[in-house]
Amino acid sequence: MEKALLLLSQAMTLGTTGCMFHSIFMENENYVNRSLQRKSGILLAGSLLYLSLPVHVAAIQGQRDWTQIGIWMLLPVLITALIQMTHTDRKVWRWSFGLVAVLVTGVIGRMDGVAGLTVLFLICIAGISRKRWEYPVIGVLGTGLAYPTYLTWKHWIIDGNFAESGLEYVSIMNKGYSIGGLFSTYFHRNGNPGMGILLMSCLIFLLYCTFVKGRKIRTGADTVWLLAVALLTFMSLRYFPWDHVQRMGQWSLGLVSLIQTPTVFFTYAQIVLCVLSVEKIGSIAMTEKTQKELKKAV
């Protein structure tokens, strides 16, 4: 039964991820003019990269963490809803997609409080990069729906009842990644997955196109996202001063202990890099194909 549920969840994740990349590529004119077969190939390749990230594989095979499996399935739904909300001209559809985004954000916050706050941060980054004031509002409303999670946190951290959480005050600084661990092809230390060879290959290819081929790939919005990725990655390292943060007071000691491991932040950095990589590589491939077709026509 569990295996059947696992297969169903991954099939649903494949579908939601395909919808996410379809929404992203709809902003690209070259994608709109492609045949259904080519569109499907691009979407399938991007979805498989998302599903094959080692941190996702670890949640399925090693830990069998249903909370993380659910979050990986819901994140593409959230991204799709946010993008579609800005594209549709009908007010009813805008409100509908906005409501879906709020609900999904709330569900993620109820499933995992740390994930909920990280997603709120990324939604605000999306609002800055796309210049959409609605995004932070949606993020705040969605986080508000998860208020039972954070009321429980308050009871544990502020009211001095941390023992009821079933956790202990711990230092998480030594649980972070080393620099080399970020680039490991699969598992690093303590079972923490690196970014994997597929994502690393995509990033190397984009660096090659930028610095060797001289392509202008990066935009101003991408810079905002890369800064967010850099911050999340730094927070996941064993060099980030989590011990100093914990010394700020009893509340900070409890809050950091609830995080349990800083490697969680690199998970979301990888997701952002995955989405950006698929978008850029797909755009490059479609642009080259269009140029070849134009040359043949001439």
Residue ranges and their predicted role:
Residues 1-298:
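Membrane-embedded transmembrane-helix bundle of lipid-linked glycan/lipid transferases
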